[in-house]
A protein has these predicted regions:
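N-terminal [4Fe-4S]-dependent radical SAM core
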Residues: 2, 6-12, 17-20, 149, ...
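Glycine-rich beta-alpha loop elements in corrinoid/cobalamin-binding modules
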Residues: 9-10, 39-169, 398
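Flexible glycine/acidic-rich beta-alpha junction loops that bind and position SAM and/or redox cofactors
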Residues: 20-23, 112, 157, 263, ...
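Glycine- and acidic-residue-enriched helix-capping/strand-helix junction motifs
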Residues: 20-33
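Radical SAM [4Fe-4S] cluster-binding motif and immediate context
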Residues: 28, 174, 179-345, 353-355, ...
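A general structural detector for well-ordered alpha-helical segments in enzyme core domains, enriched
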Residues: 36, 61-64, 84, 88-92, ...
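Catalytic cores of alpha/beta
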Residues: 112-117, 294-295, 356-378
Length: 413
């Protein structure tokens, strides 16, 4: 695109302000925002991008906007931050009447009307990079017709909400630039409380999930195929090398699960191993299946010392009901491999699951919950798990569980 204007347009990308005082800190920045910023800088000319991080108070957030005086303000959030985020949008609209407000992320994708009715001008639905960049170019050209931009919601001239056609998912993640390192205040993030290497950073290695657990909100992204997109092992290794050169010594490989494709997971490990970086550590998230001893050996080779494993339940009926697509035998086999290679495993369990069968709601019994807790305790005693976490299942908007409970009037929207 040719450079058609002299004035630089200022854009704010923000996390919801979630702290009560400025002394609080977050573990990591929003890597989605950093990837988005890098893409926008590649596709939109003559701009300045600012990042308002989550460790600001609401007043601090507003003061930063007032100081920057942006042309566009973007905020991204999931449903568990809905309340703080909607309050923020409302406050920003009240303080800055002419500012263009764009909401993105999981919650605006599911409930764009909530955001538009409280003050947002647009919602970006689904993946943000291509849509946000196209919307910015349209805004900066002062065009008033947004109907041809896929993947947005806005209010038309009659006040009715307009939702444009869905945008295709980005198939080749290698085409996306690496995160915008200059955007965030790296030293203000605490990282994980337990680690083997410091400082810490993260890489998003894939997008999407081929599985369909009923408690997950992943269906909101599955409006198109391919659902699962994997960065090439070479591309991941290149970013690892860059992060290492900046002094980081532990990397979290972020994904829904690292092993949806066993060959790819092994190839990623091998590509990292070929870098011969001896003093760096990794952590990631696995499924109990598919897995084999070779993958666990390769994880050990690259100093992957910690993995999270979603087990959820010890009951066959429940695992089938929530569509987890694993068995207890697979869980035990996976943990046995990980223990052999001295990889610390954190197991996650959910209590009082629910699902639908033959048109009727089904519920996990107290006996089944106790069986799961007993199973978790046995895994700790055998040192197959190092830590466990459990909690009540929560119906996340966009999940099949949420839709089932709404359908049977067991919760309200």
């Amino acid at each position: 695109m040719r450079r058609w204007r002299m004035e630089k347009f200022k854009i704010i990308l923000s996390d919801p302000p979630i702290v009560k005082n400025q002394r609080q800190r977050s573990s990591f920045p929003s890597f989605g925002v950093l990837y988005l910023s890098a893409y926008i800088k590649k596709k939109v000319d003559n701009i300045e991008i600012y990042y308002l991080e989550s460790f600001l108070t609401l007043d601090g957030h507003i003061n930063r906007i007032r100081k920057i005086q942006p042309h566009v303000y973007g905020i991204s959030f999931a449903s568990f931050l809905k309340e703080k985020s909607l309050i923020t949008i409302k406050k920003v609209r009240e303080e800055f009447e002419t500012l263009k407000i764009i909401a993105g992320g999981a919650h605006p994708t599911i409930f764009p009307g909530e955001c538009l009715n409280i003050g947002a001008d647009f919602c970006v639905l689904g993946e943000g990079e291509e849509t946000f960049a196209e919307l910015l170019n349209t805004i900066f050209l002062n065009k008033k017709d947004y109907r041809d931009i896929p993947g947005i919601a806005y209010k038309g001239s009659d006040g009715e909400i307009v939702i444009t056609q869905k945008r295709k998912l980005i198939e080749n993640l290698d085409t996306l630039p690496f995160p915008d390192w200059d955007l965030c205040q790296e030293k203000k993030y605490t990282g994980h409380s337990i680690s083997k290497g410091k400082p810490q950073w993260s890489i998003i290695v894939s997008r999407g999930c081929p599985f369909n657990c009923n408690f997950c909100s992943n269906p909101i992204w599955k409006h198109n195929i391919p659902w699962l997109r994997l960065r090439s092992p070479e591309n991941i290794a290149e970013e690892v090398k860059l992060i290492y050169s900046k002094g980081y010594r532990e990397i979290d490989l972020i994904c829904d699960e690292f092993n949806p494709n066993l060959k790819w997971a092994k190839d990623v490990c091998q590509a990292i191993k070929n870098l011969r970086l001896r003093d760096i550590f990794f952590r990631t998230l696995l499924r109990a299946a598919p897995i084999d001893e070779e993958l666990c050996s390769l994880l050990n080779d690259i100093n992957c010392w910690s993995v999270n494993l979603g087990i959820e339940s010890a009951n066959k009926r429940v695992l089938k009901g929530i569509n987890k697509s694993i068995t207890i035998d697979e869980v035990t086999r996976c943990l046995t491999y990980l223990k052999k290679y001295k990889i610390r495993t954190f197991g996650f369990f959910m209590m009082f699951n629910a699902w639908e069968k033959n048109g009727q709601p089904q519920f996990e019994t107290l006996e089944e919950v106790n069986n799961t807790l007993s199973f978790a305790e046995s895994l700790l005693k055998k040192k197959l798990l190092r830590n466990i976490s459990w909690g009540f299942v929560s119906p996340i908007p966009g999940s099949d569980l949420y839709n089932t409970l709404i359908k049977h009037k067991l919760i309200h929207k």
